[in-house]
Amino acid sequence: MSMQAYELRDDDRRPPINDVLEVVQRGLRLQPKRLPSWLFYDERGSQLFEDICDQPEYYLTRAEIDLLNVHAGDIADVLGEDVRLIEYGSGSAIKTRMLLEQLHSPVSYMPVEISPEPLRQSVQRFSELFPQLAIQPLCADFTRPLRLPIPPRAPRRNVIYFPGSTIGNFEARDAIDLLRKMRNEMGEGGGILIGVDLKKDPAVIEAAYNDKAGVTAEFTLNMLVRLNREIGSDFDLSAFRHRAHYNPMAGRIETHIVSSRYQQVKVGRMHVDFGDGEAMQVEYSCKYSLSDFATLAAHAGLKVQHVWLDPQQLFSVQFLVRA
């Protein structure tokens, strides 16, 4: 079945250019300066993230795939029959396929993705792999309230699928808010299937965000490329560098864009000064113990019903239900 059989529905929840400019200017007024990580994900950024997942240092994707190789059938049994799978993100070619192959008579698959082109590619990929599966793509920002399309038949349960470790990119307060939003959207009897990266040797964690090929560095600086293109700023990429280090007290990777000299950047009508060595925070990647994440989920009115681990116990997939 061709992808033309599916309507790429646009929820109009993507930020307009003026909103991007306002967000950037507000973040650059802060001390220290700070920009939101969703700015990474234009089409180039989405592709670079896929490339990051292929780097030898980036254990997260391999660990999650190893986990699914062992446990996908058990996960499908826990989710049960007639599930509507709502994925926050456009769909990993491998991980989502592994899960969909095991699901028992799923009602539909709904990828929610802010970037139109990765979403179209996802629809085409999965419509070819699963020609009998109803696919209902939604182009939207999954951090904001969603208008879910009507499924082709009534599901027994809505399951929000949030693979990878994206929940770790949210600070605790924002992660709780997002989990509460998921709790509302899944409805009574629904669940959340979520990837959670675990605390481990800090050297292993740091290497994953500082690959030798420099793909993560390119991904980080692509944010500035996007801003120059979309809002007409004049960031000089040669004058900034990527930095990511693990903060063991906070249990997270902290990613910054660092100015390599004193400089002034034009952002709209605003002129922003950067000092030599000044760091602008662009992303956190939080790591959890199992008890840490159970506590976080409880604050959102959820409880952990099942936990699956990869063979090396680097990564977890957890199933949450209403407490």
Regions found by a protein language model. Name each.
Residues 92-105:
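Conserved SAM-binding loop of SAM-dependent methyltransferases across substrates and taxa
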Residues 204-286, 290, 294-300:
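Substrate-binding/catalytic lobe of Class I Rossmann-like enzymes that use SAM or dcSAM, i.e.
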